[in-house]
Amino acid sequence: AKPVDSFARAAELEAELKRNVRGEVRFDRGSRALYATDASNYRQIPIGLVIPRDADDVIAAVAACRKFDAPLLPRGGGTSLAGQCCNVAVVLDFTKHMNRVLEINPAEKWARVQPGIVLDALQRALQPHQLIFAPDPSTHNRCTVGGMIGNNSCGAHSLLGGKTVDNVEELKIVLHDGTQMTVGATTAMELAEIIAQGGRRGEIYAGLRGLVNEHSTRIRANYPRI
């Protein structure tokens, strides 16, 4: 998507977001400056900021940005070292409201969380059950699980417990076109069923299967062992 031209439509976009988002919408210069950097040397002043209260706010923000052809950038704790949190986009900050543990299943050893939860907060919630979330980057007291997923973060014990990608069972996602779906590890039979069902989800999975079939040999030969 193209950035809003010189912020020419920023006022319209801000008004659209304020009409449809219950959380905070900030387009003032001070807020934009606060979100212009992460832990790297990069700096990009965003179009504006949305602090969603819930998933409905996220869906509304996606719809507004789609309407105005504005990029959207989900943000965690801003601990990235390579500018991942910096862009001329509408920034979604999940850390204020969408930061909870929703469910813990000790028997099956999984937890369901919101993207803005800080890793240490998750670890504290898991501790009574003698469980941990294996990846442990050095920024564990301020990085978020959503940011870890976006970055596929590792840590000192990742050789033992794996990277973030190895510790995520499924994700509930919303795409730029508004499609909502749950994704995760998929068997060949499940993949065939999803594609047969058609719709946007089936279209996406069929496209992914096509990419795998076309490029799998090259990927396996060249993908780094990390």
Where are these regions (language model features)?
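Extended, hydrophobic alpha-helical segments in both membrane/secreted and soluble proteins
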Residues: 72-74, 81, 122
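FAD-binding subdomain of flavoenzyme oxidoreductases
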Residues: 100-226
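Charged, amphipathic alpha-helical interaction segments
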Residues: 57, 70, 152-155
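N-terminal flexible segment immediately upstream of the FAD-binding catalytic core
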Residues: 1-67, 77-109, 138
